[in-house]
Each structure stands twice: as C-alpha cells, then as structure tokens.
Amino acid sequence: MRSIIRMLCICLALCLAMPALGEEAQQSAAPIVRVWLRRLGLTDRADLTLDGVYTAQLPSGVEMSFPKGSQVTVLVRSGELYLFYEGMSLHAGTALQLIRNASESTESEGIRFVEGGNFYPGDLTLTLTDQGLLRPVCTLSVEDYLLGVVPYEMSNSFPLEALKAQAVCARTYALSHVRGDPYYDLEDTTNDQVFRGVNLTYGNAIQAVRDTAGVVGTYKGELASCYYSASNGGQTELVENVWSGRGDWSYYQMTDDPYDLENPESVVRRATLKKSGEDLPEAFLTLLAQQLAEQMTAKGFDPTFRGLRVDGISAMELHTPKYDAPSRMWSKLDITFTWSGRTVTYPPAATATPEALPLADAGDQEISLFAQGQATATPAPSAGASAQPTQTPTPTATPAPVYGEWESMGETTLTLDVFPQLVRALEISISGSDNEMLTLTETDSAFRLEARRFGHGVGMSQRGAQWMPAMYSKTY
C-alpha cells in the first residue's frame, strides 16, 4: 500500500512540474554539449543526489519524477541498469535518462555524485560501455559547462580579465571540438578540458563566464582552435610543431611572451654545473662517459662514470634550434672540459669450500645403499641429545674493484643532445614532452641551465594571462 501511495506522489510531482521563466530559460538558446564524466571513475554503481526536480525516462517509455533532494542509486546487474529509490526498484534496461525539469529557482540545480560536492547542472544519461561499466554523460548548455571548466583549467583566484580570456578560449574549444560520437561530445579530462561540476563559491570564474557569454574566437568566419597551456616558457609554439594533420593555422605565430617569463609562478627547473667539475650528477657523468666510451676503452679505462673525472668546465653553449627561426628551443649543447680517466681491475672471487664431513667409525653399522626390502628402525634419541643443524658455508663477499691512478686526458669538447638525454640527466624535464625552452647563464664559478614550458606552448599561456592584467592592467 505504501509503495502505491509513494508512486502516486511521484506521478503528481511530474504533473506539477512547470517550465521556467528565469535566467535558465534565457540561456536555452546556448549551444548544448554532451560531456562524458569519465573522471568520476564509475564502475557498477552511481549514488546520486538530485538537487532539482528530475524525471527518469526509460527506453520502454516509462517515466518517474523525483522531487528535489531525492537520493537514488543506479546499479549494474547482469549487464543491465536498475534504479533504486526509497525501497523501490526499477528495471531500466541498458539506458537511463534523468531529465532536469525547468525551474525558476536561482539556487543550485543539478546532480551531485558526492553528497555536498559539486553539482552537474543538466540532464544525465547512463549507458554501459563495451566493458559493462557505467558511462555517465551530462547534457547541458555550453555556458553552464564553462562554470565547471574555467575555475579548474585556471584558478578562481586569477584576475578577472585572465578568467575572461580563459572562458573565451574554453568556449571556443568546446564548440569547435564537438565529436560525432553517438554517446558524447567532450570528455571531462585533459583529453579535452577539465570539467568538475559547478561550485557556486567560485564567484570570479562565474562572473567571467557571464560577462563573456557567447563570445568565441573565429578565423575567416569559422570557429578557431583557441589552444592554451599552463606556461609557454617565454615563446609561443606553432601548431604544426606539436600536432600532425592539415589545416590553416596561419593565425598562430611564434612570438615572444615576456609576461610568461616575468611571472614568478611559471614553472622553472634549474641545474647548476660547477666550473670546478665538483658535485656533478651521476647521470650527467654517465652521459659524458657514454660519449667518451670509445676513447676510454682504448686507454683501458673503466668506461663508466666511475672511471671518469671532470677536472674543470671552461665553456658551454646551447645551439641548433629544434624548429626554424625564430624558435629558441635549443636541441644541442656544446660542453668544453678537461678530464681524467682511470683503469679498473676485478680480483677473482674466492670459492667457499664446505667443511669435510667426519668419517664413520669402524664399529658403526654398515648400511648398503642398495639394500632392498629392509626397513631401518629409527634410533631412539639419547638422553639430553639435541639436533645439530648442518652448517651452510658462509658466502665469500665479492672483492671490491681496484682502480688505478687518475690519468689526465686534457681538454675535449662534446656535443650533447638536449632531448631527451640532457634534460633527463640533469632532472630538468618538466612534463616529459621534450619541448622545454632552455636558457644558459654563466657566473664566476658555474654554468646554470634553466628549463621552462609546462604544456604544449601553443596559444595562450595561462601564467602569461595571469600576469598581464595583474601587473600591466591588460583586458581580455
């Protein structure tokens, strides 16, 4: 009886749902995007809090309406979906849609996957992947989508004008990268743009989205590809240097970005090489030894970093840009240094000899190893006798290698590959993409290499965009 009454109440709530006349209705003309909420990592269960009036629609045509605040659970059982709500269960088959009903409420309205967490302001479609896992896809206006993108692709604490620039880039990217996939248009990960739902406390990001509503970047009347990355290292990169494929990318140029360089929050990795040759990293010495291996072997030296000593570094120079001018992504480093080598010998290891076993006394019983059918009785232990374990020979330690005296080999100049050998050996690789912008400075006692660029470097630098309005009053 209670289940019947509850079902009647749900149906009544559906009948009373009315269209909205507020701001949400005004945004109805905004383009719609479908976002696969892959970052949530759902497998066979979704616990949902409906912060709004929602209607569940099943492929069979059955509909159920849920009042705001309802908590529902969707489970995968034997390859199909089941919806559970207040003791009731509903077989949903292979697809389930939760449609948000229009409302005049100015408060948050959407679906929360974590109680008290961010909300997703749109419809939710649940289907199954080929692996039988939940595929949650949120369908919402691009303007609402940006509310969950801008403060995560760029911090809400950034200047408002920087956030506006981010909103325009993110909006243009979303609309120009809509997939033709039957299930979704965008992912909520860095495969597209990070989307984590809406947090209404991020007022700066919300204002930036509202103030730039509908603004996109275009080229020749078409949506442009407005790329951005965390930091370009002081110079923007060309699209064709990062991604393959054809296209007219003439609106992207390789230009200097002093704002990214000036921003102290731009990522920088540093390595200091003393001119005295002291305290050089083992990996760097290994790199030099590999370059000198033939010469070291010919002299009988140990061709590893242990057989090499750098006595002094007199010159270093970065050169050979990876791409055409004006690129400053150097791919080679010349290093001039004096060095010494030494021989190594390995003494033969001693062989451990186990102690000889004692011979049997003449009076001991003779036992034939080949006797058949005779069982030997187990002797009773003597009073007070204890078992004596057989001693295992102690292993002999490997003798330490014996090195000869250092022999000076004079001065030499080597050309090292910056990518990937040098940046890995000096541990100045930032993102592992082998695209860092390196600079070299010299002091009285050392050479210092600095590596910059976090991301692909194409388009807007987020750190540069942060610095421009903060220090130079630039607008988006």
Language-model regions, residue ranges each:
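Conserved, single-site charged/polar hotspot
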Residues: 2-476
